[in-house]
């Protein structure tokens, strides 16, 4: 399951890089080159792969696999302060049963008519 999350992160970041390139937006690199040239497409993808690896190593990212428990400072109400509902006095509604054509209602069931 964890491997699938890495693949999803990787696909998402590749999609982001392709979106930036298709829209012609500038993309700043974190490489330590002193040239003023724009990085090539492969360099951008390589940097994105590095970022995906770094993000995958961080276990606090729960985008696709949320934690099962969360810290909270609130307390639950005690049981005696909750309202108890009386369900013994409920009223049931009886609805007539409708049978399809060529069927009769016999002994609580729809049965086919015998000619």
Swiss-Prot record:
Residues 1-24 form the signal peptide. It comes from the Eukaryota. Its main location: secreted. One of its GO terms (biological process) is defense response to fungus. It is found in: Secreted. Antibacterial activity against P.aeruginosa is retained between 25 and 90 degrees Celsius. Induction: Up-regulated in the fat body after injection with bacteria (B.thuringiensis, P.larvae or E.coli) or the fungus B.bassiana. Expressed in the epidermis, fat body and venom gland. Residues 25-90 form a propeptide. Disulfide bonds join 99-110. Serine protease inhibitor which exhibits antifibrinolytic, antielastolytic and antimicrobial activities. Displays antimicrobial activity against bacteria and fungi. Likely functions in the innate immune response to microbial infection and possibly in the venom, as an antifibrinolytic agent. This is Secapin. It comes from Apis cerana.
